[in-house]
Regions:
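Conserved ATP-binding/catalytic motifs of P-loop helicase motor domains
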Residues: 1-149
Length: 149
């Protein structure tokens, strides 16, 4: 199966899935507010299930990104580097290799960017994401106008 097939394939929620009040609250925040969220928890607590529930129920346009290729396959997303076309190295501030996104309309139409395992993402990559988005929207503040989960 290639990556596109894995991105398009629907994944069923776990058989024992129960929509708890906590899940409802988090989904409501993801769906109806402009709040940036940092969702954390130990292995098996339901983070991936929440992502799949959001993927199936949302009306939002969003991208799912991760730091590594293996992680991006697991969440049916893209790597940060491939999505933004970043070079595979440390990225300096105002790096000339941070260019306008290959398809600015894709970024302009996004309601949210979900970064899986965000705590593993280096600071230079977060800065590069911010710089790349600023080239699209002329933002003034860090990640202004984009929601991160």
């Amino acid at each position: 199966m290639n990556q596109k097939d894995s991105l398009d394939k629907r994944v069923d929620l776990p058989e024992k899935f129960v929509l708890t009040d906590e899940f409802k609250d988090i989904f409501n925040q993801m769906e109806n507010t402009k709040t940036n969220l940092f969702i954390t928890g130990k292995a098996g607590c339901g983070k991936s299930t929440l992502l799949e529930y959001f993927r199936q129920k949302t009306k939002k346009n969003f991208a799912v990104l991760s730091f590594t290729g293996l992680a991006s396959l697991r969440v049916r997303g893209n790597t940060i580097h491939s999505f933004f076309k970043f070079p595979p190295r440390f990225i300096r501030q105002y790096d000339p290799d941070i260019r306008l996104h290959r398809n600015p309309a894709v970024l302009k139409n996004l309601d949210a960017i979900i970064i899986d395992e965000c705590s593993a993402v280096r600071a230079d990559l977060l800065d590069a994401i911010d710089e790349s988005l600023k080239k699209i929207e002329k933002m003034k503040k860090f990640l202004e106008g984009y929601r991160l989960f």
